[in-house]
Amino acid sequence: RRIARQEQSDWPALSADIRAICAGLEPELGQGNTAGARFYRQHGLPGARGEALSGFATLTDFALPAYQQAFAATANRTHALRYVFLTLLAHNGDTNVVKRGGIEALDWLQGRARHILADPAARRQPEALYAALQTLDAQCTEKNLSTGGSADLLALTIWLTEYPNLLGTSYEPT
């Protein structure tokens, strides 16, 4: 609403608005027979509804700081977004992954992503990160894993970085 009305806003205010709008969804988190509800009951994974309830805390806590770090290191938007995706894979409880491969697959994927992120070259060297992501993609394909939840969060991150006034900074090279 704030953007449609061309009101000044920032990400913390939008995140708070999202939390307020979604507050009524909390009782629904573990109800129903959807995969997301089942994974919430079994593993405490909040899925898309839980992410919205939190005002997209995964973006605030992980994706946006990762974008800032990688962009500052390289001034390369594509590289920064790849770094964000890897960061999301490491920290998001992606229920798409769990649906395809079980909680063990999520543990494996998060471990692989964290291993890649632990290499300093991942943040500073676009070629090294791209090669690591290609390898990880091939492994996920072999295991029939879909990282759709993390991809959705990446899409929201891309949208947010198109509106630097929302984040209080510009991410484009000077």
Residues covered by each model-derived region:
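Conserved phosphate/anionic-ligand binding catalytic regions in large, soluble enzymes, centered on
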Residues: 143-158
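Phosphate-rich cofactor/ligand-interacting catalytic cores and adjacent structured alpha/beta frameworks
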Residues: 1-138, 142, 161-174
